[in-house]
């Protein structure tokens, strides 16, 4: 079923065994979240998944993992070419806050192959950059409050072209799972930008910080940015 396919794609993206608690927040569909354990059990009974570490973690066999990853690359590439987005919005192509070796593997096995496939279509990096930035602008104007991973996926692909983001306008966006390490962000417009699970080269100057009610339950942070996971930063 489509929901099981979505779960297989997520397991391919994580590239390591994950628990239900780790997998559930990734899903944008509330219905899929609610029935996640049932879908995982169904996949396991059909021998499409493996359980490890006392049955609490799920993954795929290497051959299936490679097949699903290739399917992900082909599907996302086609969506970016045609402008009809489904998988590109429902799944984060890279988990910015995961371990360094996993994140590097996601870049090598998912992000870079997508970029290479797109370059075959658009011929030059400049043409591809123009196409991707136009998609980001159109989406921001038409669907400013849309949920999903569309915007962070675009930023992660632009970041690994590599391209120059100086003076670009990313205002009024909500972005999670973006890797901005090693990028020159001088004069980039991040006004009214909601950062979530995003990593940077170095600390930011913070002009305004919004603390949710659960902040009172957190240990008093040494740093406003890094030590309270439930705190969101609004610039």
List the predicted regions and their residue ranges.
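Leucine-rich, amphipathic alpha-helical/linker segments
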Residues: 62-66, 71-133
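LRR N-terminal entry segment and analogous cap-like coil->beta motifs
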Residues: 136-187
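Short beta-strand "wing" residues that participate in macromolecule-binding interfaces
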Residues: 50-51, 80
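Core register positions within helices of long alpha-helical scaffolds
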Residues: 39, 117, 154-160, 193
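Positions within the helices of HEAT/ARM-like alpha-solenoid repeats
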Residues: 18-19, 106-110, 146-150, 186
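Minor-groove-contacting beta-hairpin "wing" of winged helix-turn-helix DNA-binding domains
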Residues: 56-62
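WD40-repeat beta-propeller superdomains and closely related acidic/aromatic-rich repeat-like regions
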Residues: 175-235
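Amphipathic alpha-helical scaffolds
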Residues: 2-45, 51-56
């Amino acid at each position: 079923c489509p929901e099981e396919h979505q779960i297989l794609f997520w397991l391919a993206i994580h590239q390591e065994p994950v628990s239900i608690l780790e997998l559930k927040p990734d899903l944008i569909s509330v219905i899929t979240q609610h029935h996640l354990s049932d879908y995982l059990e169904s996949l396991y009974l059909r021998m499409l998944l493996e359980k490890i570490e006392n049955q609490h973690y799920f993954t795929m066999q290497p051959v299936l993992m490679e097949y699903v990853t290739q399917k992900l690359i082909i599907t996302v590439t086609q969506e970016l070419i045609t402008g009809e987005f489904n998988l590109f919005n429902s799944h984060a192509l890279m988990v910015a806050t995961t371990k360094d070796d996993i994140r590097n593997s996601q870049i090598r096995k998912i992000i870079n192959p997508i970029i290479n496939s797109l370059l075959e279509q658009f011929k030059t990096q400049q043409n591809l950059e123009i196409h991707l930035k136009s998609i980001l602008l159109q989406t921001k104007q038409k669907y400013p409050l849309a949920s999903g991973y569309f915007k962070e996926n675009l930023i992660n692909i632009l970041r690994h072209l590599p391209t120059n983001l100086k003076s670009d306008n990313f205002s009024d966006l909500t972005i999670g799972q973006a890797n901005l390490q090693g990028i020159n962000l001088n004069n980039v417009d991040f006004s009214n930008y909601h950062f979530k699970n995003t990593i940077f080269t170095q600390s930011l100057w913070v002009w305004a910080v919004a603390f949710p009610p659960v902040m009172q339950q957190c240990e008093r942070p040494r740093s406003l940015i890094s030590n309270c996971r439930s705190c969101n930063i609004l610039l």
